[in-house]
Amino acid sequence: MTHQLKSRDIIALGFMTFALFVGAGNIIFPPMVGLQAGEHVWTAAIGFLITAVGLPVLTVVALAKVGGGVDSLSTPIGKVAGLLLATVCYLAVGPLFATPRTATVSFEVGIAPLTGDSAMPLLIYSVVYFAIVILVSLYPGKLLDTVGNFLAPLKIIALVILSVAAIVWPAGPISNALDAYQNAAFSNGFVNGYLTMDTLGAMVFGIVIVNAARSRGVTEARLLTRYTVWAGLMAGVGLTLLYLALFRLGSDSATLVDQSANGAAILHAYVQHTFGGAGSFLLAALIFIACLVTAVGLTCACAEFFAQYIPLSYRTLVFILGGFSMVVSNLGLSHLIQISIPVLTAIYPPCIALVVLSFTRSWWHNSTRIIAPAMFISLLFGILDGIKASAFGDMLPAWSQRLPLAEQGLAWLMPTVVMVILAIIWDRAAGRQVTSSAH
């Protein structure tokens, strides 16, 4: 007999999914986009919500449909390419960007206002921070219970208070949009949504949500998909409400900070302005705990993944990943964001193509014929977009600037659509040939 979840269990699954997604990036990027977009904040918000909410939820649903992790999702592109994709996802949400970012965000919100942005305080902080991360990651047994029962609700309560405050007590009038947002607010919001890395995170952690439903006795594929979809939608609604409030917070904070300020600085300035020193201390403590929990979760997940393929023990990998993340974190938050933008701009398009096209797998004679070329083309043109967003943008040939949507950082979109159409024609033709030869 198939076990069905009670309403309480479904809500708990939704909260767990929301808590998995809400990390450092989710809190710092919406205020930054809000401040820079100014009067175009809601146009930018729509673009941001597509990549920072829509795509991660879609990824969770796609994983539930195939009943597994990123390895199941990437079946149409083959084992080697699938492993490469999984490795890129784990590196991005692990030691390259997301894990170091947890340290820099908690430092900038809690410590930098007291010490300034000099290198030595960050170095000392990062050594202590990652020593704790490594220690907890070596013995993660009780972490999940602690997170689920105490820290996740605390984090959600703090975010609700912050969101309500942003709406009820705006810091000042809306700022004027930066040049980048005057003509391309939607696409800038869309590309900035990449920076939350939630789609990559969903590929890594989506299986956790599916397994959480399984652990409660749900075995039927149809019900697993349904419950995971509900959990994803609940998390999506929560993220949307949080982001809209944080966009409002950022767009109203022009009188508090410079428009080039990063999200952590905006957040600290607003909380200091609205709640005073005690509020700032509470915010710093909560963000420290939230970031630490995220860092431990990412370190554990990455160590478990790489232990399957590298002849090193889990414990050794925890030390390596923690040490590497510590070194990277000393670049500082603003530099880390600058470096991550070109890389994420390059690797997001093939992930988007894979997730969206995974829903069409049953439509084709051979889904590999559609998905593999679409991902390849989206990666090629995504790399062009990535180079354009980097310091090497001037080295690109003139024709790359004339591609459709190139100005918006979405040069990959039209070539990928064209490739999908050509691949569909090929699949239909090749499929008919196979059938006729069989008879």
UniProtKB/Swiss-Prot annotation:
GO biological processes: isoleucine transport; L-leucine transport; valine transport
InterPro entries named in the record: Brnchd-chn_aa_trnsp_Livcs
Periplasmic side: 31-43, 101-118, 171-189, 248-277, 338, 391-404
Main location: membrane
Bilayer topology annotation: Multi-pass membrane protein
Compartments, as annotated in UniProt: Cell inner membrane
Keywords on record: Amino-acid transport, Cell inner membrane, Cell membrane, Membrane, Transmembrane, Transmembrane helix, Transport
Keyword Transport: yes
Transmembrane segments: 10-30, 44-64, 80-100, 119-139, 150-170, 190-210, 227-247, 278-298, 317-337, 339-359, 370-390, 405-425
GO MF, any single term: L-leucine transmembrane transporter activity
Cellular component terms (Gene Ontology): plasma membrane
Protein family per UniProt: Belongs to the branched chain amino acid transporter family.
Free-text function comment from the UniProt entry: Liv-II branched chain amino acid transport system, which transports leucine, valine and isoleucine.
Protein's name in the database: Branched-chain amino acid permease BrnQ
Gene: brnQ
